[in-house]
Amino acid sequence: MCVLFFVVSGYAGTERGQSLRVALIQAHLQWGDVDGNLKAFGERVERCGEADVIVFPELFASGCEMKKGGGDKKAEIAARYGDIREKLKEWAVNKKAVVMGSTIFAEGDRYYNRLIAAFPDGKCLYYDKHNCFKKGAFSPGEGQLIFDYKGFKIATYICYDLRFAEWSRNTTGYDVAVYVANWPASRREDWQKLLRERAKENKAHVIGVNCAGTDPDGLYYAGDSGIVGTDGEWIDRCDEGKDEIKVVRIYKN
């Protein structure tokens, strides 16, 4: 497989410290309700304190199953892409932090699950999910996103990417890998195990941020958001099923 990396080095900041404060937002999502989710995440962001990086779950403005409650809502959610991106930029500027989460992006007749990383200067970088769980639901992206921020090289991934060790192989020397997800509780043991494996095999901190609660079809999400150290052991974790914000300081090896 030929892997294209988008490695960006222009966001190192003015001070290259050896620690990074990461806010994990494990949230109950309002499925299909963009306005409700944007309002709720705006309130959550205000409670993050002095974080350097703020991480939301996958598809934070809508939830992941676009057919829940009847009808496919991908086009409806994709039409709000500009509003969602502007909110991420606003929060990043106001909090002086990198704020990241994924949403639906449309290009022609193709839909992508796009992670947006918004920076304090108002600029954004993007990663389109490569390993898609359901064929046809989203088109796969072709490249990876790895960027420097405050002395840390950070790689970004989305949910099902976690199962593919080669896709996140640390060939670029990243310090932190971020996985945003809507990962159901029925496979929570896999989520916990794979986060630890990716950290240990790549000798990098791994951040996993999942949604929590129950969706309209009764599918339960345990959350299990947390940060794993380079030794494969948990540094800190959110409580099961809880709408919770946890700010954790990690140190560069």
Regions found by a protein language model. Name each.
Residues Y81-A97, R163-I245:
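CN hydrolase (nitrilase-like) catalytic-core segments centered on the catalytic cysteine
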Residues E43-P120, A185-E197, E201-A204:
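Cys-nucleophile CN-hydrolase/nitrilase-fold catalytic domain and related Cys-dependent amidase chemistry
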Residues I54-V55, F152-I158, V178-Y179, I207:
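Short hydrophobic-aromatic micro-motifs
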